[in-house]
Amino acid sequence: MSNLYESIRKYKCGYIEEILNILDMFDPLLNKFQRNSCYEDMKSELSLFMFNLIDNFPLEKDCFKEDKFIINYIYKSLKNKFIQVNKLHQKVKSYETNIDIIWVNNCDYANLLSTVIFEDIIKDLTQNEKNILRKIYLHGLRESEISRELNISRQAVNKTHLRALEKLKKLIN
């Protein structure tokens, strides 16, 4: 096994084939992450990430003159990317499950897409604010109907509705 620092330096100087040697060095780690994931394209995702990682690698730092620091840096970066991709994949799977449930209920795709986007937008609000916004915008209920359903005043519903919209406005800006 050649010096990892030298391989990265050569790759950055234009020896493109060095990236294959670097990928071969980390192939067991990529395979491990692939086995530990439900996502079938995990190895490809991490390999592409490694290309970007090596391209932007900070070789000028003195601590990266030794292989042990480079290996640790790449390992931690790959692990963080693995976690990020897994979370994203689980979120997509969750949405797909919701899509299947909604399709069973004969919902159209445009409505489904807007519902998924709506849920993603309101994720940072309180449960009460989410509930009121869902009833107003997804179910088409008026504030007076919501107030009767929740046994609170119409003014309380209106105040919560406006507060939620203000929070969303701040989040967007």
Swiss-Prot record:
Residues 143-162 bind DNA. The lineage of its organism: Bacteria, Bacillati, Bacillota, Clostridia, Peptostreptococcales. Belongs to the sigma-70 factor family. Residues 122-169 are annotated as: Sigma-70 factor domain-4. CDD domains: Sigma70_r4. GO terms for molecular function: DNA binding; sigma factor activity. Keywords: DNA-binding, Sigma factor, Transcription, Transcription regulation. It holds the Pfam family Sigma70_r4. InterPro entries: RNA_pol_sigma-70_dom, RNA_pol_sigma70_r4, RNA_pol_sigma_r3/r4-like. Gene3D superfamilies: 1.20.140.160. This is RNA polymerase sigma factor TcsR. One of its GO terms (biological process) is DNA-templated transcription initiation. Sigma factors are initiation factors that promote the attachment of RNA polymerase to specific initiation sites and are then released. Transcriptional regulator specifically required to activate expression of the toxin gene locus, composed of tcsL and tcdE/utxA.
